[in-house]
Swiss-Prot record:
Mg(2+) 2 binds at D118, D269. One of its GO terms (molecular function) is ATP binding. This is Phosphoribosylformylglycinamidine synthase subunit PurL. It comes from the Bacteria. The active site is at H50, H96. Substrate binds at S95, H96, N97, H98, R117, Q241, E313, S314, Q315, S534. The keyword Ligase applies. It comes from Sinorhizobium medicae (strain WSM419) (Ensifer medicae). GO terms for cellular component: cytoplasm. Its EC number is 6.3.5.3.
Length: 743
């Protein structure tokens, strides 16, 4: 099928391109005439939510994005942060939600491919990947099929490309039944004096197309990613791109080789809206026009129209502004790697975006208004509604030991081994901590002691209950997970997944979550350096849980002192850093209430950022001085789940006392923030206690390691083997069932 280049512009056609009547009026006023069909497609791609951030830009500007280590914040392909010694880490997280629901394998695979390109476009070699996945209820007929396809797609692309997957999340909730989330993170290493940007410079310079050929896959993908779903979703399958990780690996090597020659003035990967977005962004950032001749674009399908070529989202492609004298040298590199190299246009001084096809001018538009001066909205939002606290007599009871077994074997708290064993976690040979701990850790090649830690976090049920506190908590938990390895948290990337921003109650979630994220990042010196917004995650008016995923990076100065979650040996002292007087108090929005009693009421836990910082800095100091033997942050499932995970990771049991005269349920299952379980060798307990007192950090002794069971207070002991069996069984049992019908 080919799309005609001369279709009449009708209200239905305008609406099908995701443009509102007032936006179309704005186009008419801007260009003084009716747009051509190709121009309509270009406006649709550049002015949609996915490319323009028109609903969120106002609020994103409020986030803290600067810091002493920040080399490049938001606005480029990825953020860049200094990690000393002339090295920097380049990273970003981005969603591929809508495509992954329609076509799970290719949607997830190209999500990984896209984020890897964002990183190596900046001149960095990718060293780590993570993915945060959210699926519908396990008993929904599509869920198993989607899990299987997405996990295979993530693994298939990342493994073949050759980047280790070191962390991530997998969560189930009925609110994702119609819209799953696939948030992909990648990080790479570069030299601080060799970072490449997308801003075009110089007039009359060649614009070069690099990589794979252009096909019809993904035409209209960015527009599809900015729309709600309805019953016609299956018809959108052709808008999903198809990826080839081996071509991408060649593209990586060719780009890095080319970058060493001094030939590259500006470079931009072709992601959402393909050739359109990459050309417009390069030109608009550099205050230059761009002229493209589509007859020179390498294609793999016959009779492609200008519309299709401009909006194709074929993968593994780059656009570059090149030094003309380096043309032959550059071409030789790409030919060597078996990739296309074609001069498809030039930079101009007239701020116009001109497209030529078969001798005709099919588009001539103002480039700034397409790019950095696209429409921006201040959408209405409602005041936040926060649930009232639970009454003290409204904490339902359950057997503490039975609850522990039930939770470790539940859909959302069980082992994710089935998932991450499909990913290559060790490729490149630098992985120090694998999925299953608080954070993934990767050695920095060329340095004896330096490593980087990575974590991805958000608790959507908290954000739903209180978007402001939930936004704070996502940042705080990410910061805490990095700290728990001994890393100094450096910076973060945010992936904001929400429903339809035209609904004031959804816009309210987005606004308050961003406010919470900003406040936490400010307080924790954890700036946001890159990110992505995914809106319209709704099907038939049912929105997802608000899910502002935070991906963070931390610096480990000496990985030989790095902490892990597993108990080291028996007969060590267990302490709870940052504990309130009764160790745990907050049961609202806990997994205990949700998974044991089916209740989702009550407020989200409060995040005291000063407390969070004080306790985290204290724990990191203990790790750096070699005074603790294991560390694990307390999050979902509270103290009980944290201790159980430490026991399961090591095979060593634990006996935990219980503070007298306090209800055991909030003590063990409360989800108070800013707490870490730490173990200390007996000879170091006094030193650690003295340091805690000096720092003003609560550090009660709560128990001892040893034995082959976990005993919580007066509850019966539960053997580590029983916990492991329950923990490891859920995922393989679920996925081993007959595949649910794909309908």
């Amino acid at each position: 099928m080919t799309i005609s280049n001369t279709r009449p512009i009708t209200p239905d056609l305008i609406a099908s391109h995701g443009l509102k009547p007032d936006e179309y009026e704005r186009i008419l006023n801007l260009i003084g005439r009716e747009p051509t069909f190709t121009e309509l497609g270009i406006f649709s791609a550049m002015w949609n939510e996915h490319c323009s951030y028109k609903s969120s830009k106002k609020w994103l500007r409020t986030l803290p994005t600067k810091g002493p280590r920040v080399i490049q914040g938001p606005g480029e392909n990825a953020g860049v942060v200094d990690i000393d010694d002339g090295d920097c880490v380049v990273f970003k997280m981005e969603s591929h939600n809508h495509p992954s629901y329609i076509e799970p394998y290719q949607g997830a695979a190209t999500g990984v491919g896209g984020i890897l390109r964002d990183v190596f476009t900046m001149g960095a070699r990718p060293i780590a990947a993570m993915n945060a996945l959210r699926f519908g209820s396990p008993d929904h007929p599509k869920t198993r099929h989607l899990v299987s396809g997405v996990v295979a797609g993530v693994g298939g692309y990342g493994n073949s490309f050759g980047v280790p997957t070191v962390g991530g999340e997998v969560e189930f909730d009925a609110r994702y039944n119609g819209n799953i989330l696939v948030n992909a993170f990648a990080a790479g290493l570069a030299k601080t004096d060799a970072i490449f940007y997308s801003k075009a410079e110089g007039v009359g310079l060649p614009v070069v197309y690099l990589g794979a050929k252009t096909g019809r896959d993904g035409v209209g993908g960015a527009t599809m990613a900015s729309a709600e779903f309805d019953e016609s979703i299956e018809e959108k399958r052709p808008t999903v791109q198809v990826g080839d990780p081996f071509t991408e690996k060649c593209l990586l090597e060719a780009c890095l080789e080319l970058m060493q020659t001094g030939a590259v003035i500006a470079i931009q990967d072709m992601g959402a809206a393909g050739l359109t977005c990459s050309a417009v962004e390069m030109g608009a950032k550099g205050d230059l026009g761009i002229e493209l001749d589509l007859d020179k674009v390498p294609v793999r399908e016959e009779r492609m129209t200008a519309y299709e070529m401009m909006l194709s989202e074929s993968q593994e492609r780059m656009l570059m502004v090149l030094r003309p004298e380096k043309e032959e040298e550059a071409k030789a590199i790409f030919v060597k790697w078996g990739l296309d190299f074609a001069i498809v246009g030039k930079t101009t001084d007239d701020l116009r975006f001109r497209i030529l096809h078969q001798g005709e001018e099919v588009a001539n538009l103002p480039i700034k208004e397409l790019g950095d001066e696209a429409p921006e909205y201040d959408r209405p939002w409602t005041p936040a509604k926060v649930p009232s606290p639970l009454a003290t007599n409204d904490i339902p009871q359950a057997d503490v030991a039975d609850t522990l077994l039930q939770l470790v074997g539940s859909a959302n708290n069980s082992s994710r081994r089935w998932v991450y064993e499909q990913y290559d976690t060790l490729i490149q040979g630098n992985s120090l901590q694998l999925p299953g701990g608080d954070a993934g850790v990767v050695r920095v090649e060329g340095h004896e002691a330096k490593a980087l830690a990575f974590s991805s976090d958000v608790t959507p049920r908290y954000v739903e209950a209180d978007p402001f506190e939930g936004g704070k908590q996502a940042v705080a938990e990410c910061w805490r997970n990095l700290t728990a390895t001994g890393a100094l948290p450096l910076a973060a990337t945010d992936n904001l997944n929400f429903g339809n921003p035209e609904r004031p109650e959804i816009m309210s979630q987005l606004v308050h979550a961003i406010k919470g994220i900003g406040e936490a990042c400010q307080a924790l010196d954890f700036p946001i350096v890159s990110g992505n917004v995914s809106l319209y995650n709704e099907t038939n008016g049912q929105a997802i849980l608000p899910t502002p995923t935070i991906g963070g990076v931390g610096l480990v100065r000496d990985w030989s002192k790095m902490a892990r979650i597993r108990f080291a040996v028996a007969d060590e002292t267990i302490l709870l850093a940052g504990a309130p007087k009764s160790w745990g108090t907050h049961i609202g929005q806990s997994v205990y209430m949700r998974d044991i009693h089916g209740r989702t009421d009550g407020p989200a836990p409060h995040v005291d950022l000063a407390h969070e910082r004080k306790v985290g800095d204290f724990v990191r100091g203990l790790i750096g001085d070699g005074l603790v033997t294991a560390v694990h942050d307390c999050s979902s499932g509270g103290l009980a789940l944290a201790v159980a995970e430490m026991a399961m990771a090591s095979g060593i049991g634990a006996t935990i006392a219980a503070p007298a005269e306090h209800d055991a349920i909030p003590v063990f299952y409360g989800e108070d923030q800013g707490r870490y379980v730490v173990t200390v060798a007996n000879g170091a307990v006094e030193t650690v206690a003295a340091r805690a007192k000096a720092a003003g950090v609560a550090l009660p002794v709560i128990g001892r390691t040893g034995g082959d069971a976990v005993k919580l207070g007066d509850a019966r002991p539960v053997s580590v083997n029983a916990l492991r069996s329950a923990h490891e069984a859920w995922f393989p049992n679920y996925m081993g069932g007959d595949l649910a019908p794909d309908n």
